[in-house]
Amino acid sequence: MDTHTLKSVSDLPGNFRSAFSFRYFNSLQSECFPLCFHSDINMIISAPTGSGKTVLFELCILRLFSKSISKEGSFLHAKGALKTVYISPSKALVQEKLRDWNQKFNSWGISCLELTGDNETYSTKNIQDADIILTTPEKFDAVSRYRVTSGGLGFFSDIALVLIDEVHLLNDPRGAALEAIVSRLKILSSNHELRSSTLASVRLLAVSATIPNIEDLAEWLKVPTAGIKRFGEEMRPVKLTTKVFGYAAAKNDFLFEKRLQNYIYDILMQYSKGKSALVFCSTRKGAQEAAQKLAQTAMTYGYSNPFIKSREQLERLREASPMCSDKQMQSYILQGVGYHNGGLCQKDRSLVEGLFLNGDIQVICTTNTLAHGINLPAHTVVIKSTQHFNKEKGHYMEYDRSTLLQMSGRAGRPPFDDTGMVIIMTRRETVHLYENLLNGCEVVESQLLPCLIEHLTAEIVQLTISDITRAIEWMKCSYLYVRMKKNPENYAIKKGIPKDRVEKHLQELCLQKINELSQYQMIWTDTDGFVLKPEEPGRLMTKYYLKFETMKYIINTPTSYSLDEALHIVCHAEEISWIQLRRNEKKTLNDVNADKEGRLRFHINDNKGKRKKRIQTREEKLFVLANDWLTGDPSVHDLSMTQDANSICSNGSRIARCMKEYFIYKKNYKGTLSSTLLAKSLYQKLWDDSPYLLKQLPGIGMVTAKALHSMGVRSFEALAEADPRRIEIVTGRKYPFGNTIKESLSSLPPKVEIKVEEVDCQKQGISKLAVTLSRVSQPLQSTKRHYADLIVGSEEENLIHFHEKIRMEDFSSPYSVTVLLERPHQQTKVTVKADLIFEEYIGIDLHETLLLKKANNNKVNYKSENRMPQYYPPMASACIADDDNPVTSGPSNRKDKKDDMPSFKLIDDDSEEEKEPYVTMEEDDCVIINEHTVFDHIREKAKCFPSLNPLNPTSSPASGKSILKRKSLVENNSPELDPLFQYDSVFDLPTNTKDIKQSAQQITSPGYASFAEKTETERPFSDETIFNYIRKRSKNSPALATSKIENPITISSQEGRNAEISPYRTYGLLVSPATKIPRITSDAPSEILSFDISMVKRSDTSLEQTKGFCSTLAGKSNVSDSFLGFKSIFSFL
């Protein structure tokens, strides 16, 4: 384009001219100017690196802002109403654009927000208010996944412009995320419910390097023909020459890159022509070592150093060298060489950059971040190895195309050079890949198919897809559909298939994936398989970015599993399946698993339970490696295995967190605890029983942790009490290191206490538990949030009864929750545990245990607590039988009973056999027995049954119940006791030990027992009468303590009632219908405890003495039960 046709910045409205520092746009920008600024059509631009494509983004942003300019020419900004989303393949590019656009647009009130892994401080409100969102594909996809349940996707409807930088990323495995989010935006924009929103008319603009199939991308993005712009190498300001050199592979990627250092000097001497050069290395250490190698080589030439051209240059280097704080860098600068990475301080980085721009330093060895950030062009660019170490994946990976193009774009300095040189050093087998890459001959294909099921699940979870029709429509919005029609063989479609059948194949593929998801209960479908709804496993797989195979493995896990089994699940995960067992690693792993020092928590065992002598599989390697790493002091120092271990910990922690939430959903108590502990351990790279727990604190590494361990400081509590000066002496550090270490304790969550107790036992055997959290220390003023999971579960049932996630700084102390728990019926006991498990830190979790005994007919509640035991002495022979309803195990409801008889609560045999569980009694029910309380209580009971006359079972048929009252033996007939003594003669019971034994032996056939008719007028009993009767029954029944009947004996009556004598040590009698044979279960006493009325009538006994006296009697009654003695009095209380 001629210069007279170049567009001027003055063609923009006056409000926007300050956005550009130049007067004219270049030829590429001028040609795209009308479409970018004066229209809203979608566009795709293919142009070489460095041709000025970024300005096109800014023109489209200004076009969007121009809609907010009033007729008067003022800029009226509505915060967040019209959003721009900028998507870049790298965080470095995002941060570069963020700095640039903040500087340009901030004065207009435009807010920019970075959404990358480096920025986790944003909130939903920040996203809602942002005008420009700068993000990477993976992060934008993850943000939309995480916030779907909290309504965090509301900003989608405000998206008006989407800018896609380096769209050729689609050809990279990472391109699946980019394809998924663009397809999501496309299908949402076609949603009828959003037809009135900004998203319905969203504009898409994509730029890329030179690619051969730009038309396919245009079809996917719905770009009209006018919006397709293709520019060749003529648009590049400096012509580039590319050379690709292949080298033989080494044993591992690390050694291969290190070996390439030997070739760099010769390459620079041959191709740089004495001009400036950038050497891109994959790691900081690699950049430093490359600079060291070049400086040492140049030093051998003395005054003939090829990197120093003049004496003046040498003098400037000598002056600058002492200004560098890095001692090693000082020696490199003197040779005309430097290195640049994130490990340098800002002062040293600025010094190196200035020396390079001035031409004093000829060579800089740097990491790939310099390719995206500071503009330091050079004549020659050397890319030392095409692989870099990916921290997220934990292993070496090939550079993506955009990164390589960015590095190559640094070659050539427009003001000084008219040519540039790019040297790529790679392995021999990958030479052809990079030749096609730089020449623009590589066709961009879709990478969505290998992870289609995961992205399909994500759309169902986000409700983008609600039925089969919508699912097929979403797939048609993908780049996969476009390339399937153009190149079906590349996507597992038979060669030669008609193009019209591609759509049918796509539908079959969609149905296949949905059936798989439904089979594993990740989604729900109706009977017709049409409606699609997400299930919790599918939500979790989407939330934690897990592979489908990994989630299947978690779902198929046995119900009950331990911590080591949880670690085995992680080792089988698809996310770390790329880690392989190398031959040279087997000996080291075998030695680690042998564990002669007893360092490891778990080992690989054979079928006999012994430690395996040989590690044979990839999963076994991962398991051993993880155990060695989690000791806190690993014995494996091999770089390759160290990288593998880091990958296990980073990916494993995410997988374990997903397992935790899945088992909470399944209410699996043991699985939840194991997964939670494993997730924290992998995150901290420590087991919870490690002696180096202090490594969790900032500023404490392994050396400091070992030093503290040697002085006995092994816990957070011990560190809080330690002397700062002694810490400095032991660690060999200077003041105020000790104070700093102690201050790091402020990063821990506030200290709390947990308590669990049983507060009530309701009907149907339901226990009410109270779990209380109390904050012991006040939370410190900190921006860090601490969360913990409160879990209440039972071990025997492996069941979670309650779960809540709590923010430790915010809950109101004390915080109490009520948990209803069904008492055990089949098991003899249930161990209830309340656990407060912190999300991040290990070694500070809280656990509390409560023991619940099996529910019995009398519904006595047991609990373990720090309360003195209180016992209800058992009744001797009082029972109530119900003709209509069977006796249930639930507690009796006093309101449903008539007041004509007292309620007698019997204690089960198990209640006095256990030492730890106690019978619960509310404090208000505890009564001190004295003269007044005993007689008052008897009078109250006497009101309910004014006469203890015999009941005629035939006289009240309407009631449907017959009640058997207690019968005893009598020796002498006192006139005032006749109404009581007549009960003894009803069944003709014996009155002494000898007669009792004979009666027991002679009853061999059913007999009859009937109640006598009432023959005299009812009259109430006096207090003295009752106690005399009790006293005589106590003295006249010693034989009952030793009698024992081996088998129960049934006594039949003419009224159709049966009485059964229990074989237990206590005699009792029960009357019920013939179809119900009751059993008397009271225990017979082994020792008679007599009671005299004078004990109660002592008026001079003090309150304290009375308390002690009653406690003594209650204690004796635990081991010695009387038949009709003191315990009968207690049964009324």
Curated annotation (Swiss-Prot):
It is an enzyme of class 5 (isomerase). Residues 878-919 are annotated as: Disordered. One of its GO terms (cellular component) is nucleus. Disruption phenotype: Low levels of fertility due to a significant decrease of meiotic crossovers. Residues 263-460 form the Helicase C-terminal domain. It comes from the Eukaryota. Residues 893-908 have a biased composition (Basic and acidic residues). It catalyses: Couples ATP hydrolysis with the unwinding of duplex DNA by translocating in the 3'-5' direction; ATP + H2O = ADP + phosphate + H(+). InterPro entries: DEAD/DEAH_box_helicase_dom, Helicase_ATP-bd, Helicase_C-like, Meiotic_Crossover_Helicase, P-loop_NTPase, Sec63-dom, WH-like_DNA-bd_sf. Residues 34-229 form the Helicase ATP-binding domain. ATP binds at residues 47-54. Expressed in meiocytes during meiosis. One of its GO terms (biological process) is reciprocal meiotic recombination. DNA helicase required for crossover formation, complete synapsis of homologous chromosomes and bivalent formation during meiosis. Is specific to recombination events resulting in interference-sensitive crossovers (class I meiotic crossover). This is ATP-dependent DNA helicase homolog MER3.
